[in-house]
Amino acid sequence: MTTESLTLSEPGDDSPARYEALTRIRLEDPDAVLRAARARRPHPGPVCGRQNFIIAADHPARGALAVKDDVHAMADRRSLLDRLRIALANPMVDGVLASPDVLDDLLLIGALEGKLLFGSMNRGGLPGLVNEIDDRFTGHTAEALAEIGADGGKMLTRIAFDSEHTTAALEATARAVDSLHERRMIAMVEPFLSTARGERVTNVLTTEAVIQSVAIAQGLGARSARTWMKLPVVEEMERVMAATTLPTVLLGGDPSSSTDEALESWRSALRLPGVQGLTVGRTLLYPDDGDVASAVETAASLLTHTTQETR
């Protein structure tokens, strides 16, 4: 079987065998992933004035499967792929941020034509580990991302002044920024000021903490020319955006609020200078009413889609 002969049912089919063809290709023809990557049509590239909409799907690789009260929401890979296919079918969605396993599935399916591709690079800081802050780069490498024609790599960078592992985490991010820059790819850095007290790492989501995390993260690496920030939406986002000249995408975060509340919080932040778009996953893939297409459509309507539009 080849990707050319791959036929899949439409999302919504509940057959447990609906993605069996992916397993067969991975077994019999693993090189099909690279062929699919090289054959696909790339995205024309980000431009100033046109905000980008990227769907994030790298949470399972960190063992983060919960969405609100459903602790195993993202555990079903078939359901996740269904939801991603629905989201990526919207022409206003520019691309995806995913771990290698998910990205390879989407390449085989052919769901990434004309899309931006960002790989998730560090997934080793599993929740609850004693050295969670030392978030090892266990996912995509810059070399592997270049091989599949990706646009960049993303790294979570948690800065905990109460953890001895913070220096190693900062150094690892800096080396990844350098490696991506050498290959002319975007380094999407997602910084948080965090605390390692207690059983789990907690991100500090005050305006001042986010500003400090930006100040530290944007200076990582020998070159910043291709570095982007990926930041949470907090109060006084205008102060946060005043802290950087780097292109910035807003993250969805832990979907603890309602889908409507999340959308409203993004609306005003997207109007700020320097905000290049949204990189959101669980809030839109697992909306309150279950309607992925509608949630994605509503989020897309918040973005500036042409370079002629003004804010």
Task: Go through the PLM ranges and name each one.
Residues 63-65, 257-260, 286-289:
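Short active-site-adjacent structural elements
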Residues 69-91, 95, 103, 108-110, ...:
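Alpha/beta enzyme core
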Residues 58-59, 254-255, 284:
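Glycine-rich beta-alpha junction loops
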Residues 1-136, 276, 307-311:
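Alpha/beta catalytic barrel-like cores
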Residues 3-4, 8-17, 22, 41-45, ...:
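N-proximal accessory regions
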Residues 157, 252-253, 282:
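Short glycine-centered, acidic/aromatic-flanked micro-motifs in structured strand/loop junctions
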Residues 278-285:
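Short acidic/histidine-rich active-site segments
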Residues 285-311:
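C-terminal helical cap(s) of enzyme catalytic domains, especially alpha/beta-barrels
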